[in-house]
Amino acid sequence: MEYEYPIDLDWSNEEMILVINFFNHVEKYYESGVTAGDFMDAYKRFKEIVPAKAEEKQIFNTFEKSSGYNSYKAVQDVKTHSEEQRVTAKK
């Protein structure tokens, strides 16, 4: 699937990589599954770059329009699992 990641050009290269890494974890959550601990680590790094809820919501909406993947729902679901547990949107 081809789509663009929501990137702020004011971010450093490292910050862009960390944001893309988080969205890669969202993709894995929907496509094949991801370990809850790994997903939450990527989300925590994302939050260091995007601490404001309003900006997070805007970025999540942009990503969902591009990819069809709801990052908010993924985060909420993963939060309910233990770190070692493998989580997927596929039931």
Curated annotation (Swiss-Prot):
InterPro entries: BH2638-like_sf, UPF0223. Disulfide bonds: none annotated. It comes from the Bacteria. Pfam families: UPF0223. Belongs to the UPF0223 family. HAMAP family: UPF0223. This is UPF0223 protein SAR1071. It comes from Staphylococcus aureus (strain MRSA252).
